[in-house]
Structure formats: structure tokens, C-alpha cells
A protein has these predicted regions:
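Intrinsically disordered, low-complexity proline/glycine-rich segments
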Residues: 1-108
Length: 108
């Protein structure tokens, strides 16, 4: 089954004591590739800084997982895997929001 593609404005799960975060306007590496009117997200896109209730500093997560079969050419000319609901960030978050009409690759 295809996973719903992620876009600017979509959210992450949070992790441990760190709160959920979102992908801000401008966080997409593919500003010309849109889904439901929002730029799509790929591997290497970053979420907004998210803090913790502990004294730990805020961190910024980077998408490290994407569709094994769907790639998009980003603004820098590099083809990257399309990010989907359930894909991971290097901080421990997962993507939890995504497009309602477009999916890509299989999410295990």
C-alpha cells in the first residue's frame, strides 16, 4: 500500500520528552513540486526546532527515510526519495501528517 506523501506544514510525532514539530514554509527542497498546493518533502528536509520539557536544548530533525520507488528532482538538481507518513527523521521523530490524495511507494 502506498504511503501518503508529506508536505510543508505536516507534523512529526515528537520523541521522548521532545514535543511534536512541523515542517515550516520553506523547508521543502523541492519548492516547484507541490501536492495539494503545498511543496512536497523529501529525504534531507528539516523540521522546525522542537524542545523538551527537560533541560535539553531544542533540536532540528532531518528526514532520513523515504519511498524506495518514488524520487523527485529537487531545486538543487539532486533526485531524492519522497517522504511519506511513517518515514523517520534522524532525531527519532516520524512523519504523522500527509496528503489525502497522493501516495508513493510501500510503507512497511
Amino acid at each position: 500500500m502506498a504511503g501518503s506523501m508529506a508536505r510543508e506544514g505536516d507534523m512529526t510525532t515528537g520523541h521522548g520528552s521532545y514535543a511534536p514539530s512541523k515542517f515550516a514554509v520553506g523547508s521543502s527542497l523541492c519548492q516547484k513540486a507541490t501536492i495539494e498546493g503545498k511543496p512536497m518533502l523529501t529525504v534531507d528536509a528539516k523540521c522546525e526546532p522542537h524542545g523538551s520539557s527537560s533541560p535539553s536544548p531544542a533540536i532540528i530533525g532531518t528526514i532520513i527515510e523515504g519511498s524506495p520507488t518514488s524520487f523527485v528532482k529537487c531545486d538543487d538538481g539532486v533526485y531524492r526519495k519522497v517522504a511519506r507518513i511513517g518515514d523517520s527523521l534522524d532525531c527519532g521523530c516520524k512523519i504523522v501528517w500527509g496528503a489525502k490524495t497522493v501516495g508513493a511507494g510501500a510503507n512497511a
